[in-house]
Amino acid sequence: MACYLVISSRHLSNGHYRGIKGVFRGPLCKNGSPSPDFAEKKSTAKALEDVKANFYCELCDKQYHKHQEFDNHINSYDHAHKQRLKELKQREFARNVASKSWKDEKKQEKALKRLHQLAELRQQSECVSGNGPAYKAPRVAIEKQLQQGIFPIKNGRKVSCMKSALLLKGKNLPRIISDKQRSTMPNRHQLQSDRRCLFGNQVLQTSSDLSNANHRTGVSFTFSKKVHLKLESSASVFSENTEETHDCNKSPIYKTKQTADKCKCCRFANKDTHLTKEKEVNISPSHLESVLHNTISINSKILQDKHDSIDETLEDSIGIHASFSKSNIHLSDVDFTPTSREKETRNTLKNTLENCVNHPCQANASFSPPNIYNHSDARISECLDEFSSLEPSEQKSTVHLNPNSRIENREKSLDKTERVSKNVQRLVKEACTHNVASKPLPFLHVQSKDGHTTLQWPTELLLFTKTEPCISYGCNPLYFDFKLSRNTKEDHNLEDLKTELGKKPLELKTKRESQVSGLTEDQQKLIQEDYQYPKPKTMIANPDWEKFQRKYNLDYSDSEPNKSEYTFSANDLEMKNPKVPLYLNTSLKDCAGKNNSSENKLKEASRAHWQGCRKAVLNDIDEDLSFPSYISRFKKHKLIPCSPHLEFEDERQFNCKSSPCTVGGHSDHGKDFSVILKSNHISMTSKVSGCGNQRYKRYSPQSCLSRYSSSLDTSPSSMSSLRSTCSSHRFNGNSRGNLLCFHKREHHSVERHKRKCLKHNCFYLSDDITKSSQMQSEPQKERNCKLWESFKNEKYSKRRYCHCRERQKLGKNQQQFSGLKSTRIIYCDSNSQISCTGSSKKPPNCQGTQHDRLDSYSIEKMYYLNKSKRNQESLGSPHICDLGKVRPMKCNSGNISCLLKNCSSGPSETTESNTAEGERTPLTAKILLERVQAKKCQEQSSNVEISSNSCKSELEAPSQVPCTIQLAPSGCNRQALPLSEKIQYASESRNDQDSAIPRTTEKDKSKSSHTNNFTILADTDCDNHLSKGIIHLVTESQSLNIKRDATTKEQSKPLISEIQPFIQSCDPVPNEFPGAFPSNKYTGVTDSTETQEDQINLDLQDVSMHINHVEGNINSYYDRTMQKPDKVEDGLEMCHKSISPPLIQQPITFSPDEIDKYKILQLQAQQHMQKQLLSKHLRVLPAAGPTAFSPASTVQTVPVHQHTSITTIHHTFLQHFAVSASLSSHSSHLPIAHLHPLSQAHFSPISFSTLTPTIIPAHPTFLAGHPLHLVAATPFHPSHITLQPLPPTAFIPTLFGPHLNPATTSIIHLNPLIQPVFQGQDFCHHSCSSQMQQLNEVKEALNVSTHLN
């Protein structure tokens, strides 16, 4: 029977949906054989299944039986939608996966990048503390290792390599970097200096080792990835927690470098003499050139080479110290590279010793010149003195231009260093033993304002006051100018060195004597090499090291008069480029840049000069303690600054105004000074090479010497340095002359520092300190080498005011006018030794001293006069040579004498500068009167004489006020002056350019006038930068008014412009300027037409300045300023820049961009306000009559002088405006002439507390030019002081009541509207009584002027 089988499977064998059920009928064969039709059925079913399978949609999971149905489905929206969704899901999934993986990768990359950045920041912060960008990573790593005492003793090679790589870039350090080395690490520079001495037993390295070291060019070393110290961003305000940390903050390598520098001398003298000679022979001039080109890399290599040989010898000694010592020795050994390498070595040794001393005695300010750092041990100081003497001798031998002589000199110096090294060994051993615990750190532990949080602050961000106890203050690193801080540190170190050198004059003298000839040629050669090549930026990395280098750069400068002097000043100015070897920077950037063609000539001249000056230098060595290598010129220069006896000599010179050769009061002053003149002459030449008046300055060094000595003689201390400066500056008219002057002034600045008058860099200016200052200033000089030529005004303004960069910019501008400004700075120097150095040293001083800036102005003014006199070839007069040349010498002598005397009594620098300025200003008034009345053609001689007398009178009367102003904020308002200086400089630049024909008496006179103006500005700078600007403007206004006296119409315009600026900027500033406050506004206010004419006719004005000496001068300045309103505004902006932060201590500085923006904003706001006020004033002014200020000039004035500090300027201007108005009302023909008649009798000397300096701007004391003993204990901030508005009736009516025109009265009444805020002034002294007194004095002055009219 057939079975019926129902197949229920819904799917085919292939998995396709079957959808049909087949019923198979038929008998089932028992045998299983299929029925006959089974095959057919099977095939049919299979075909159906296949067909149906073809109609199955997997995506939609649908089975279609018909082809058309299937096609319809495939084309349907549902099917397409599902397809899209499927694809989208797939894509999204893939995207998600990819994005996730990408994000993960990015996160990883970000994390890695962040880690790298952190590591970089840590290294940089450590490097900053180490002051060595060239050695950032190595310093960080090595400092950590040194501090932790982790010194791989793998034969001392690893550590040696590390330290060598850091300091010497691949130099193998001594293999013995064991616990001894660790112990000595804190006293690294000591150990470095004594490495040979202390570890003489360790210097077991044989000559084979030495040869091996020479062959070991490559070294393998590793730096720890972790940074030992990290700068905490939260540390914005802090107090010094530990002094030891400050000592440690210098990177151990840095200190080691210092120590090595010192040790170099010792080892070089003892064991490395042969090595040194060998290395001298081995190293080729091309190598030197390469070293000069790459001071960091090549110096490191040279140090490496020397290290290799010296390392082998000293390998047993402390590895790092030996390495530094070797590198230092190597530097000195390499004659062709003595400048950069020796400087580097000296700086390294200096830093090393300094650091060693720093740990034990961070607060100790007396440090031998090698130890530029303030903190030092007596023993270390001795060692440093020895080292400095040895090192300078070494350097001098290195300086020898002839390799043979260099080698011989080095041999001699090595002998000396051997002797010294023994002492140093003892001293260093003791010091190291005592100071092993302290280790150099890149940071100081400081306390945050909360009082309990200890922050690690970079050493570079810390500045220490010179007072005892030392107070450290810092600023936000974001706004911190590290180069500037280095400069400041160097200045402090220079002061210490100065003191130390004063202590050890005999040692240094003897050593220098033996070293002068030795280093001369080598240093000259090195200087020339450096001069030829771009300045390496390695040397300046460490401020101490730079200081050390600078000291020896000064030596080098002496060796190479042009380059050396230039280098010195450039280095001083080069503080801005602390990473470049000081002397290298100066000579290379400025001299090489400017006088590459004349380089060889300068070099030759330097060699000849050095050879000719060696004897003088040797003589100077006896007298000059700290400048063994500064050969005669610097010796002489330094001799004067040699703190103890030099100060005395300076005083003595002040008494003996006439002996130019007795500048330092030293036995060899004549000879040395004449040599110095030659040196300065050459140096100035090389420095002026860029300016194009190199030869002009060369001819004048001797004459300048006379002037210099005369100016030095004028004042007890200040005069001495002034004369040095004057001779150097005048004959050089360049940074070199400034350098010389600066050294003397440095010495005097020590004096002043003692007087508390100059607590800043001035104090460093003792001989050794001068050296150190030069060393640290050399970067400044290098940066501002051009400034040296023209930085007098601008450098100070910028340097003091804000930044080395500003200063450098100014320097660039001022370079063109270096000669003129140098002379003026010389007179400033007479006013104040530090300022006296011209701007050469002032850049560093600017940081610390407003007096310096003021002096810089004065000196610049003097320099203008000097230049004019030089042009007249009246260089015979000692002190007043330059002024005397253009004008009767007595004018300058009197002015400078007055200045010096005033300065000597009080803040000599400020008073002198003010006095000189004041003298010139009244002189101008008198001259203008004479010229206007008599219209005599004796412009040159008459102007000179009249200027001399008038300057004195003016100094007594109007300038006394500036003096007062200047003295008041002597420590506070540095920045204000620089801007004024900038403006003045701008005008002065024009003046100088116009007086590119310096011989032209007219130009000289105009320069003289400008000088006076600047002096006044400098004066005000101390008190208020605004005051400064005002005084400066007053002087110029007086000169303008006087000049316009010839034409009543012109006078009326100037008066209007003059008075208007006062109206605009005259907030009640009772103490600022009693009667005449020249205002930068005034410059702007000056008749645009007239000003433009004056500017356009600047040269003519220079000529007419003979007729209108002061007026012409001021006019030329103002006219130039007015001629180019943009320039005037720029200048005013600069003034504002300097004025706005003047009272704030420089250490707290903002970036130049921030300062500019801030100042611009303030200027705009104040200009707007003043425009409104001026519009009101102008409305009233017409009633004043013809003498009233013209609206045009007033309008001009307003925009010119708006600034944050303008309120102060306004106050001063209002006063000056009222005075001018009264004067103009009384006599339109000579409005300013009335001011100058004021005599000192009108102003009684007033002494103020430390806070009063800011308040005193208008005090009679300042007006009288009496020295005020004002010391700013703390930086003054604008918030600290707000001038109390005086009742218009109380202030102005009393002062101007009888003399004021209606317009003037109205303007004066507007004064209260402007509330002068003296950033650094304390109003306790700005009492109504003092204001009334000042008003009365101004009244008297006005009366006198009226009588004169």
UniProtKB/Swiss-Prot annotation:
InterPro entries: ZnF-G_patch_domain, Znf_C2H2_sf, Znf_C2H2_type. GO terms for cellular component: nucleus. Residues 985-1010 are annotated as: Disordered. PROSITE patterns: ZINC_FINGER_C2H2_1 (PS00028). Keywords: Metal-binding, Zinc, Zinc-finger. GO terms for molecular function: zinc ion binding. It comes from the Eukaryota. A zinc finger (C2H2-type) spans 55-79. PANTHER family: ZINC FINGER PROTEIN 804B, ZINC FINGER-CONTAINING. This is Zinc finger protein 804B. It comes from Homo sapiens (Human).
